[in-house]
Amino acid sequence: EEFVRDFSTKYYIVRTAWLYGYVGHNFVYTMMKLGKDRDTLNVVNDQLGNPTHANDLAYHILKLIQTEEYGVYHCTGKGECSWYNFASEIMKLSGRNCTVNPCTSEEYKSMYPNSADRPAYSSLDNMMLRCTIGDEMRDWKDALKIFMDNVEK
């Protein structure tokens, strides 16, 4: 970001979080696979963020670059949740018979010591995006439902 800011005054820096889409590895696909293979999962309940559907991100970036309102924008799914909430919704929508149990980051780290450290709060506010293009990102649950309706379960 600093390089871009130093290089030009005409830039769009777009920040997102908890991104998932139809291609590649992501949390949704991981949970679906684990939910198929296991009866129970322990998922962190003390880290909050905004699940973001890649299609929504792409759509809003396209709208944004049609303006000349350069700057830094947050572009994430509307609303926030924990990884536990996200995983629970994935299991519900996928029809998996897997119980999702909440745990703390500390408990998770003791079970999986090689897991990556994550921030406790990575939620972003899309205010500048709303003010610039007059449009809001979809609620994370609505976007996830559409995603789940279009993937093989």
Mark where each language-model region is:
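Tryptophan-centric aromatic hotspots in well-structured domains and transmembrane helices
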Residues: 18, 27, 70, 83-86, ...
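Glycine-rich Rossmann NAD(P)(H)-binding loop
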Residues: 43-48, 73-80, 132
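Mid/C-terminal beta-alpha module of Rossmann-like enzyme folds, strongest
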Residues: 60, 67-115
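A general structural signal for well-ordered alpha-helical segments in protein cores
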Residues: 1, 27-28, 54, 58, ...
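Amphipathic alpha-helical segments that line or abut small-molecule/effector binding pockets
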Residues: 55-63, 141, 145
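Conserved C-terminal active-site "lid" loop/helix of NAD(P)H-dependent oxidoreductases
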Residues: 82-84, 88, 107-152
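Residues that recognize and position ribonucleotide moieties
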Residues: 12, 41, 50, 79, ...
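NAD(P)-dependent short-chain dehydrogenase/reductase
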Residues: 2-49, 56
